[in-house]
Amino acid sequence: MNSFSPTEDTIAAIATAVSPGQGSIAAIRISGSSAIETSKNIVDVPGIQDWSTHKVLYGHVTEENRKKYIDEVLILVMKGPRSFTGEDVVEIHCHGGIIPVQKILERILAFPSVRRAEPGEFSQRAVLNGRLSLTQAESISELVSARSRKAAELAINGIEGNIQTTIQSIRKRLIEQLTEIEARIDFEEDLPLLDEKHVKNEIVAIKKDLNELIDNAKRGSWVRSGLKVALTGKPNVGKSSLMNRLSKQEKAIVTDLPGTTRDILESEIILEGIPVTFIDTAGLRDTKDIIEKIGISRTKKTLIHADLIILIFDYSSGWTNEDESILKQLPINIPLLIVGNKSDLTNDQSFEKVPKYILKKENLVIISAKTGNGEDDLINYLLKKCGSSQTHGLDIALNERQLDLAKSTMKSLENINKVFDEKLPWDFWTIDLRQAINYLGELTGEDLTESLLDNIFSKFCIGK
Ligand SMILES: Nc1nc2c(c(=O)[nH]1)N(C=O)[C@@H](CNc1ccc(C(=O)N[C@@H](CCC(=O)O)C(=O)O)cc1)CN2
Ligand SMILES: Nc1nc2c(ncn2[C@@H]2O[C@H](COP(=O)(O)OP(=O)(O)OP(=O)(O)O)[C@@H](O)[C@H]2O)c(=O)[nH]1
Ligand SMILES: [K+]
Ligand SMILES: [Mg+2]
């Protein structure tokens, strides 16, 4: 566990989402050594009530002069270490809406020993006090922001500790190899020979496990943040019409004037539990119109960040040089679907106006945004790309921070290939192995500086 010094201040924050007219109950959470004392000072509880742990008390929070009541409340006392943070925790459950909640919080913060909690600070304390592992705390935050059931399921797995145990076991295997090697460096003559090939094979096996986690992380990120699908193509091919149809909304303006769309527009649907955001963009062409030019430059920026690009062309008039030129300009590392639109206007000869190499592509779908013909094929393609078949069996998903560290670990382990091929002495193996072990330690939080930890938790929401 980490060995940071225990925190002194008592912290307080609103723990529930509050807005006027919404939520009949809200909770304020106080954690730290003066949590109970402070609470006793601001509430009147009738009769003799017991402030012992895991009990609920009934009472009223008073104004500062103790003459008037701010609200009628329930108070939940959890004495450390038997609490979420491991410190003394008091929750005050008051009426919802913003005014009572804020007045009570202000009343609490007026005590010099209490200050407002930073975002994520309750969870950070839970980690520092050994109540939660880092990846568990991160998973709690992911559960809070989950937008689909699958995302919630993955977050629960993380809360149960599956990321922590998986990474720890990989890290342990690396430590075993490092220990063997270091023993050879220190006491070569007393120990049986260590076979380089044997060590290399174990590292290959570890890399395979890590790689699986890295692949899963990509699918996990679709589940969590959804899939961004950018629609592009020449002006007037029907990008906006297609987005409107897929999202069953008349969100984008559609006219027969080329260059209608300028601002980037987004519309979300949920496909088999995965949020899919369609992004409608300005049609690509050379133009002197200043506004359209800005729109086109935004289109290009959007395309780089898409998970999938749909290139639309007008199937009824055929594949043109402009379509070809757009195709060539698309970022090559992003999956592409080509959609021939306006099939309702075509006759039997339309396919002759489209080159064979385009027609033969398996990522080609012919549709009509007007009649809806072919829409099912398009949806099926998207499902194949991101639907439940892709996320079936997915039970562990690293977040972005964890993924970066897993990738850095991979890089360090890959360096060892060179060390092996060049038959370098054992000292060289230890450099990259130690680096890999450190990365995984940063991932699990076992090897982490205080400032890195601050940085991770600052991204949590307030009161978490
Ligand atoms: N009202 C409320 N609901 C909540 C939370 C909270 O802080 N307050 N949680 C916050 O995220 C989650 C639950 N997490 C919690 C984790 C541990 C303890 C706790 O008191 N643990 C003690 C007692 C367990 C026992 O009696 O066996 C312990 O572990 O020792 C409480 C809540 C979700 N619901
Ligand atoms: N017949 C037919 N017309 C369509 C179809 N899809 C779009 N249109 C028409 O084509 C014209 C252009 O449609 P938009 O959706 O505005 O095309 P766009 O690609 O968004 O155009 P820009 O935003 O200007 O780049 C409109 O008149 C639409 O009604 C289709 O499948 N069949
Ligand atoms: K148009
Ligand atoms: Mg448009």
UniProtKB/Swiss-Prot annotation:
One of its GO terms (molecular function) is metal ion binding. It is found in: Cytoplasm. It holds the Pfam family MnmE_helical. Its EC number is 3.6.-.-. K(+) binds at residues 236, 255, 257, 260. Its cofactor is K(+). Keywords: Cytoplasm, GTP-binding, Hydrolase, Magnesium, Metal-binding, Nucleotide-binding, Potassium, tRNA processing. (6S)-5-formyl-5,6,7,8-tetrahydrofolate binds at residues 29, 91, 131, 464. GO terms for cellular component: cytosol. Residues 226-387 form the TrmE-type G domain. GTP binds at residues 236-241, 255-261, 280-283. SUPFAM superfamilies: P-loop containing nucleoside triphosphate hydrolases (SSF52540). One of its GO terms (biological process) is tRNA wobble uridine modification. Binds 1 potassium ion per subunit. SMART domains: RAB. Mg(2+) binds at residues 240, 261. InterPro entries: G_TrmE (IPR031168), GTP-bd (IPR006073), GTP-bd_TrmE_N (IPR018948), GTPase_MnmE (IPR004520), MnmE_dom2 (IPR027368), MnmE_helical (IPR025867), P-loop_NTPase (IPR027417), Small_GTP-bd (IPR005225). Belongs to the TRAFAC class TrmE-Era-EngA-EngB-Septin-like GTPase superfamily. TrmE GTPase family. Homodimer. Heterotetramer of two MnmE and two MnmG subunits. Exhibits a very high intrinsic GTPase hydrolysis rate. Involved in the addition of a carboxymethylaminomethyl (cmnm) group at the wobble position (U34) of certain tRNAs, forming tRNA-cmnm(5)s(2)U34. This is tRNA modification GTPase MnmE. The lineage of its organism: Bacteria, Bacillati, Cyanobacteriota, Cyanophyceae, Synechococcales.
